[in-house]
């Protein structure tokens, strides 16, 4: 999912990091900060550093499992490995495992601007099947 405005970026970050969804923040990880304000500030600073304040602000992926198929610890490990492998440490990101439903699921929000090169991430139709699903399959299978 594309995040198109600054307020949408902050709201999405705040939503996935909500304590009541993550067992008091137990299941939150990433490389951009420990609270929504810090993560947002880091992402916006990267955009400012590269002069890329316009356009999409970030991306939000959700990875979910069927009820009973995964526990929070395993889901955390999967999202941590996915973030490291897919984003390669080049994008600011935060991920969170939500345990407030009958099925475990994780959210990843990452900056639209690469903090190393300054290029913007491009997501095109079919990229999930071609590039993203193979990474999750490799980690999960």
Regions found by a protein language model. Give the residues of each.
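N-terminal nicking endonuclease/strand-transfer module with a His-rich metal-binding environment
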Residues: 1-141
